[in-house]
Amino acid sequence: MNKSKRPFTKSKRSFRRRLPPIQSGDRIDYRNMSLISRFISEQGKILSRRVNRVTLKQQRLITIAIKQARILSLLPFLNNQKQFERSESTPRTTSLRTRKK
C-alpha cells in the first residue's frame, strides 16, 4: 500500500501550552491562602492531581499545606454552606381552628 494515501491520518493541530498553576516563585505553605484555595473544590475537598495539573511532588506539598491549614483552623474541614442556608420562607396562613366537643 502506498504510504502517501493513508486514509486515517489526522492533521496535526497546534496547541497552546497551559501555564503551570504554580510558578517557580510561589511558596507552597499553609499560610499562603491565595495559593492553597485554588486547589480546593467548592465543597472543601482537595482536588486531584489531574485536575490541578501539578507534579506529584507539588501535589504532596499542597496536600500537606491544606491539612496543616485545616488543623490550625485557617481552612474549614467541610464547606457545607447549603446545609445552613435558609430557603425562602412562605408566610403561614393562620386560621382559627374550632374545637369539636
Swiss-Prot record:
Domain of life assignment? Eukaryota
Q: List the signal peptide residues.
A: none
InterPro entries from the xrefs? Answer: Ribosomal_bS18, Ribosomal_bS18_CS, Ribosomal_bS18_sf
Give the Basic residues compositional bias ranges: 1-19
Provide a GO biological process annotation: translation
Which keywords describe this protein according to UniProt? Answer: Chloroplast, Plastid, Ribonucleoprotein, Ribosomal protein, RNA-binding, rRNA-binding
What Gene Ontology terms describe what this protein does at the molecular function level? Answer: small ribosomal subunit rRNA binding; structural constituent of ribosome
Write out the annotated subcellular location. Answer: Plastid, Chloroplast
Could you tell me which PROSITE patterns the record lists for this protein? RIBOSOMAL_S18 (PS00057)
The similarity comment for this entry is:
Belongs to the bacterial ribosomal protein bS18 family.
Protein name from the UniProt record: Small ribosomal subunit protein bS18c
- Origin organism is Draba nemorosa (Woodland whitlowgrass)
Q: Which gene encodes it?
A: rps18
